[in-house]
Swiss-Prot record:
Protein name as catalogued: Chaperonin GroEL
GO BP field: protein refolding
Sequence similarity: Belongs to the chaperonin (HSP60) family.
InterPro entries in alphabetical order: Chaperonin_Cpn60_CS, Cpn60/GroEL, Cpn60/GroEL/TCP-1, GroEL-like_apical_dom_sf, GROEL-like_equatorial_sf, TCP-1-like_intermed_sf
NCBIfam families xref list: GroEL, PRK00013.1, PRK12849.1, PRK12850.1, PRK12851.1
Subunit structure: Forms a cylinder of 14 subunits composed of two heptameric rings stacked back-to-back. Interacts with the co-chaperonin GroES.
EC number: 5.6.1.7
Pfam families named among the record's database cross-references: Cpn60_TCP1 (PF00118)
Subcellular location: Cytoplasm
Alphabetized HAMAP family for the sequence: CH60 (MF_00600)
Entry-linked SUPFAM superfamilies: GroEL apical domain-like, GroEL equatorial domain-like, GroEL-intermediate domain like
Amino acid sequence: MAKQIKFSEEARRAMLRGVDKLADAVKVTLGPKGRNVVLEKKFGSPLITNDGVTIAKEIELEDPFENMGAKLVAEVASKTNDIAGDGTTTATVLAQAMIREGLKNVAAGANPMGIRRGIEKAVAVAVEELKAISKPIKGKESIAQVAAISAADEEVGQLIAEAMERVGNDGVITLEESKGFTTELDVVEGMQFDRGYVSPYMITDTEKMEAVLENPYILITDKKVSSIQELLPVLEQVVQQGRPLLIIAEDVEGEALATLVVNKLRGTFNAVAVKAPGFGDRRKAMLEDIAILTGGEVISEELGRELKSTTIASLGRAAKVVVTKETTTIVEGAGDSERIKARINQIRAQLEETTSEFDREKLQERLAKLAGGVAVIKVGAATETELKERKLRIEDALNSTRAAVEEGIVAGGGTALMNIYNKVAAIEAEGDEATGVKIVLRAIEEPVRQIAQNAGLEGSIIVERLKNEKPGIGFNAATGEWVDMIEAGIVDPTKVTRSALQNAASVAAMVLTTEAVVADKPEENKGNNNMPDMGGMM
């Protein structure tokens, strides 16, 4: 296929047009008075959203050179979303400002490489200063503030704060679509895995169709159990203690299953069997997790352990176990807290090393189950369109909150970037490097300017006043007042602000140092579209 090439100023201008088209569509959503954008969907109703990355991903421009510019800025939003989970609109606004200011200077004869070095120097100082003014997040109230700002909804803020309080910072919080109109929180405390009882005769509560074991022993093995002879020694010891037994095995079948069911029905003793969760190596790891959580051991022939020689000392214990048709939940395992902590740290180390998204998800689940539990936020709304929009907002809020817990918070509403303005301005640089620093200074004014414009105010006036205010004081666009941003609960996660700035600078530097752009030549339609006369045919 033939290619078309544009060089230097012509190439950069074409890309800038694409950058502007995408950024102008995204930046109308910034701030408390930001508007929505409606996205056409090939199937189903249109999607209404104010999520920067969702809008950026939808934009495809006809001109291939403009499209390249748009795609580069979409990459800024996407990368920021991957790292911090929020701040995609801020990143887009920063990137547009840096590219626009940079191209003006390149057109005036500045050296792009010098500008690039200046941008990198300024961003490095800005990131250090953001870390210096960052405050650690404390308590449920702070978490609720971060979530409420991101979702623009106080009720959502409270829900997320409660979820994080219940399952801990490492807990898994998932979003599901609710059948009703309201958004509510459902928390599963303890460790839950998706395997239920192997026989319905094992249930203890016929109304709820579940087996509830109070203070049970837990036998954990990776073997298939079919002979009752293997289980007899340990069963006799458990019966003497007068406590129920949960058996987690690859499978329980045949004579062993029949004996357990008959004794349960006769009331001799209460035992429930469930299949081991997961497959292959993941199954071994999950069984080991359960063993550590409950203070038991995995009975495995690989480790030289046999079922018939198992004693009560090798069994795990828990305050309560609830087994349904599809799930098993272990509450308050009796494991040693130091061993559980060590296991959590081991999984965290694996999380940092893994490159697979699937493995990361599974490790995160295991971590959550050991650390506290799983919370499900069931998102409700009156219409499907509202439901999708609300779910996206809550997802952003959740990511934002996690980022805040990780790296702390700074004043929101673009104020934090303005608070570090003077430190960046004090960087010693000469020539084109100094120009690069000035480009970053102009860009860090842009979020405040845009938030003010979206609120129907003159951005430049707000920016100038902010430069002279003492640190932490900012403009609350929702009320039109000047307040202490952190006290007023208007905060941004440091990680979100930092990632937005770093990713915007990275892509801006790439665009400024572009000297040629190559794209496919559009194919002309050679076919003759005029249909021949049908000659009077019916």
